[in-house]
Amino acid sequence: METNYQKFLAGEYCNHLDQEVLQMIVQTKNLLARLNATNITDSATRDALLRQMLGSIGKYSSIDINFHCECGKHIFIGDKVIINMNCTFLDDNIIKIGNNVLIAPNVQLYTATHPINANERFVNDWDERSGDLFFRTKALPITIDRKS
Protein backbone atom coordinates (compact mmCIF):
# COMPACT_ATOMS: atom_id res chain seq x y z
CA MET A 1 0.00 0.00 0.00
CA GLU A 2 1.33 3.44 -0.93
CA THR A 3 1.93 6.03 1.76
CA ASN A 4 0.48 9.52 1.39
CA TYR A 5 3.98 10.76 0.66
CA GLN A 6 4.36 8.24 -2.19
CA LYS A 7 0.94 9.27 -3.52
CA PHE A 8 2.03 12.91 -3.55
CA LEU A 9 5.12 12.13 -5.59
CA ALA A 10 3.06 9.93 -7.94
CA GLY A 11 0.65 12.83 -8.61
CA GLU A 12 -2.29 11.09 -6.92
CA TYR A 13 -4.82 12.57 -4.51
CA CYS A 14 -3.57 12.28 -0.94
CA ASN A 15 -3.84 13.61 2.59
CA HIS A 16 -1.51 16.54 3.19
CA LEU A 17 -1.99 16.14 6.97
CA ASP A 18 -0.14 12.82 7.00
CA GLN A 19 2.44 12.70 9.83
CA GLU A 20 5.34 11.87 7.49
CA VAL A 21 4.52 14.87 5.29
CA LEU A 22 3.88 17.19 8.25
CA GLN A 23 7.17 16.24 9.89
CA MET A 24 9.05 17.07 6.68
CA ILE A 25 7.26 20.43 6.41
CA VAL A 26 8.01 21.36 10.04
CA GLN A 27 11.70 20.50 9.63
CA THR A 28 11.86 22.64 6.48
CA LYS A 29 10.07 25.57 8.14
CA ASN A 30 12.67 25.53 10.93
CA LEU A 31 15.51 25.60 8.38
CA LEU A 32 13.75 28.38 6.45
CA ALA A 33 13.46 30.48 9.60
CA ARG A 34 17.21 30.18 10.10
CA LEU A 35 17.95 30.86 6.41
CA ASN A 36 15.76 33.95 6.24
CA ALA A 37 17.26 35.27 9.50
CA THR A 38 20.83 34.84 8.21
CA ASN A 39 22.54 37.93 6.85
CA ILE A 40 22.71 37.86 3.05
CA THR A 41 26.48 38.46 3.26
CA ASP A 42 27.00 35.27 5.32
CA SER A 43 27.18 33.08 2.22
CA ALA A 44 28.83 30.13 4.01
CA THR A 45 25.95 29.74 6.50
CA ARG A 46 23.29 30.34 3.84
CA ASP A 47 24.91 27.79 1.52
CA ALA A 48 25.10 25.18 4.31
CA LEU A 49 21.42 25.70 5.19
CA LEU A 50 20.37 25.44 1.53
CA ARG A 51 22.36 22.24 1.06
CA GLN A 52 20.73 20.78 4.17
CA MET A 53 17.22 21.79 3.08
CA LEU A 54 17.12 21.31 -0.71
CA GLY A 55 17.38 18.20 -2.85
CA SER A 56 20.42 19.82 -4.50
CA ILE A 57 21.83 23.19 -5.47
CA GLY A 58 24.46 23.63 -8.15
CA LYS A 59 27.65 25.65 -8.41
CA TYR A 60 27.40 29.44 -8.54
CA SER A 61 23.68 29.30 -7.66
CA SER A 62 22.02 31.47 -5.05
CA ILE A 63 18.68 32.16 -3.44
CA ASP A 64 17.99 35.70 -2.27
CA ILE A 65 16.23 36.80 0.93
CA ASN A 66 12.71 35.88 2.00
CA PHE A 67 12.57 32.47 0.30
CA HIS A 68 9.77 30.05 1.18
CA CYS A 69 9.14 26.41 0.31
CA GLU A 70 7.09 23.49 1.59
CA CYS A 71 9.30 20.40 1.77
CA GLY A 72 12.63 21.65 0.43
CA LYS A 73 14.07 18.28 -0.50
CA HIS A 74 11.98 18.15 -3.69
CA ILE A 75 13.78 21.20 -5.12
CA PHE A 76 16.71 20.50 -7.46
CA ILE A 77 18.62 23.55 -8.69
CA GLY A 78 21.25 23.44 -11.43
CA ASP A 79 24.43 25.47 -11.88
CA LYS A 80 24.43 29.26 -12.32
CA VAL A 81 20.86 29.77 -11.11
CA ILE A 82 19.72 32.99 -9.46
CA ILE A 83 16.46 32.96 -7.51
CA ASN A 84 15.60 36.52 -6.61
CA MET A 85 13.93 37.80 -3.43
CA ASN A 86 10.47 36.87 -2.11
CA CYS A 87 10.06 33.62 -4.06
CA THR A 88 7.79 30.79 -2.93
CA PHE A 89 8.14 27.20 -4.15
CA LEU A 90 5.45 24.81 -2.89
CA ASP A 91 7.34 21.62 -3.60
CA ASP A 92 4.93 18.85 -2.64
CA ASN A 93 6.29 17.23 -5.79
CA ILE A 94 9.58 17.67 -7.65
CA ILE A 95 10.71 21.12 -8.85
CA LYS A 96 13.71 20.92 -11.20
CA ILE A 97 15.46 24.08 -12.33
CA GLY A 98 18.11 23.57 -15.01
CA ASN A 99 21.43 25.34 -15.48
CA ASN A 100 21.68 29.04 -16.34
CA VAL A 101 18.22 30.08 -15.14
CA LEU A 102 17.27 33.48 -13.73
CA ILE A 103 14.11 33.69 -11.62
CA ALA A 104 12.62 37.14 -10.99
CA PRO A 105 11.43 38.50 -7.62
CA ASN A 106 8.09 37.31 -6.25
CA VAL A 107 7.87 34.22 -8.46
CA GLN A 108 5.63 31.49 -7.07
CA LEU A 109 5.85 27.85 -8.19
CA TYR A 110 3.06 25.58 -6.94
CA THR A 111 3.13 21.83 -7.50
CA ALA A 112 -0.10 21.38 -5.52
CA THR A 113 -3.37 21.45 -7.41
CA HIS A 114 -7.05 20.73 -6.86
CA PRO A 115 -9.89 19.73 -9.20
CA ILE A 116 -11.44 22.79 -10.86
CA ASN A 117 -14.95 21.40 -10.51
CA ALA A 118 -16.15 22.07 -6.93
CA ASN A 119 -18.13 18.81 -6.89
CA GLU A 120 -14.88 16.92 -7.44
CA ARG A 121 -12.78 19.18 -5.22
CA PHE A 122 -14.70 18.59 -1.98
CA VAL A 123 -15.38 15.23 -0.32
CA ASN A 124 -19.17 15.01 -0.04
CA ASP A 125 -19.31 12.30 2.63
CA TRP A 126 -16.41 13.70 4.68
CA ASP A 127 -16.21 12.65 8.31
CA GLU A 128 -14.09 14.89 10.56
CA ARG A 129 -13.04 11.84 12.61
CA SER A 130 -11.54 10.14 9.55
CA GLY A 131 -8.24 12.02 9.71
CA ASP A 132 -8.67 12.83 6.02
CA LEU A 133 -9.02 16.26 4.47
CA PHE A 134 -12.42 17.61 3.38
CA PHE A 135 -10.99 18.48 -0.03
CA ARG A 136 -8.89 16.68 -2.63
CA THR A 137 -5.35 17.75 -3.43
CA LYS A 138 -2.51 16.33 -5.47
CA ALA A 139 0.87 17.58 -6.65
CA LEU A 140 2.43 17.53 -10.11
CA PRO A 141 6.12 18.11 -10.94
CA ILE A 142 7.52 21.33 -12.40
CA THR A 143 10.57 21.57 -14.66
CA ILE A 144 12.18 24.82 -15.77
CA ASP A 145 14.67 23.86 -18.44
CA ARG A 146 18.13 25.31 -18.83
CA LYS A 147 18.62 28.86 -20.08
CA SER A 148 15.03 29.84 -19.30
PLM feature spans:
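Short, glycine/charge-rich beta-strand/loop segments that flank catalytic centers
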Residues: 47-48, 66-68
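Terminal amphipathic alpha-helical/low-complexity segments used for targeting or macromolecular assembly
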Residues: 1-59, 116
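Extracellular beta-strand-rich, repetitive "passenger/adhesive" scaffolds
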Residues: 61-63
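Flexible, glycine/small-residue-enriched loop-and-beta-strand segment within the central core
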Residues: 67-77, 82-147
